[in-house]
Design a protein with these regions (language model features):
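Short helix/loop segments within enzyme catalytic domains
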Residues: 83
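Catalytic cores of DNA base-excision repair glycosylases
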Residues: 71, 76-79
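Residue-level marker for buried hydrophobic side chains located in beta-strands
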Residues: 39, 79-80
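Catalytic core of the metallo-beta-lactamase
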Residues: 1-72, 88, 100
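C-terminal domain-tail junction helix/linker
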Residues: 92-94
């Protein structure tokens, strides 16, 4: 079981566990600082955010999660969504219409 703040180590790398509820309860993202990457599932997409119309989804919670957990990462961090093209934190800060 993983929780926000946990660090998963493998080899010489590590993933920091971030809690990003909103798309669904208990949603997690995984930040790999050594390669400046974050794996976000369906929380954030290039120019969009995840759906919140499923059971347990919350638009307000998702926006809060993205702003507090993801947009605070370094701008050059590459965002790898669950599907679709990759993007960067900086690009989403500047151009994602759902975050303004």
């Amino acid at each position: 079981e993983l929780h926000a703040g946990d660090c998963v180590k493998f080899g010489h790398s590590e993933l920091h566990v971030l809690e990003v509820p909103g798309h669904s309860p208990g949603s997690l993202a995984f930040y790999a600082p050594s390669i400046k990457a974050v794996f976000v599932g369906d929380a954030l997409f290039a120019g969009c955010i995840g759906r919140t119309d499923f059971w347990g989804g919350s638009h307000e919670q998702l926006i809060k999660s993205i702003r507090e957990e993801l947009l605070t990462l370094p701008g050059e961090t590459t965002v790898y969504p669950g599907h679709g093209p990759q993007t960067t934190i900086e690009y989403e800060k500047l151009h994602n219409p759902y975050l303004h």
